[in-house]
Amino acid sequence: HGNVSKRLAQHSDLITCYRMAPHEDATESRKRAVENLVTRLENGKGKPKYKAWVPVPILLPGEKTSTRVEPGKSLYAQVPEVEEKDGVIDAAIWIGYAWADEPRNHAVVMVTGDDEKAVTEGAEKLANSFWDVREEFEFVAPTKPYEEALETALASDKKPFMLSDMGDNPTAGGAGDVTWTLTELLKHEEFHVPGGKSLIYASIPGPKLVEE
């Protein structure tokens, strides 16, 4: 979900990112990054001759970009196919981080290598493929406004019933310090009466409370 600006692309000799969401390929991604670096040092070629940076005017939240389902599954399956071409070192689709308030907040395709034609064509292929399926991405879980979601949770017999605040998700770059949701939850009597609904709220940073 990284946001790659033109400046970052220009000043990064080698760059790569995860190819699975959820990020089950963390180990593979680290290995790929290290192997690319070591290989370039050992063969004496150093920096890649060419870098293709293609901004794609798409902005998607992580909850819509799972690679376990379509279209993400097929889209990301094309990444290693591009990387396997002669003259290509790495290929990546950066979905972008939707909650970042900055100009570089959009998707990007990056391909690096020593063959200009292979790098260019690979980047264009991935960018066009991404654009072609831009309207097919859907939320991987039910979504509702806060009040409707809470009403559904309170009426359900399922335990636990989990609600996620997509806009302040500390596992996806959020600070986790927005208290609005917790404040609204505590207004409900169901969480204050004996024998009422129990609530676990995770999480808001509280260094002083931890120290106590």
Residue ranges and their predicted role:
Residues 105-109, 159, 195-199, 211:
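Structural beta-strand/beta-sheet cores of well-ordered domains, especially the beta-sheet scaffolds
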Residues 65-71, 152-154, 170-179, 212:
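Short glycine/threonine-rich loop-to-helix capping motif typified by GTGT followed
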Residues 1-47, 160-182, 186, 190-206:
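Active-site histidine-anchored catalytic micro-motif
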Residues 60-62, 202-211:
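Short, conserved secondary-structure transition motifs
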Residues 4, 8-11, 29-37, 71, ...:
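General structural feature for long, well-ordered alpha-helical segments within catalytic domains
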Residues 19, 23-27, 86, 90, ...:
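Generic local-structure boundary detector
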Residues 45-54, 60-151, 155:
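Accessory alpha-helical/coil subdomains and C-terminal extensions
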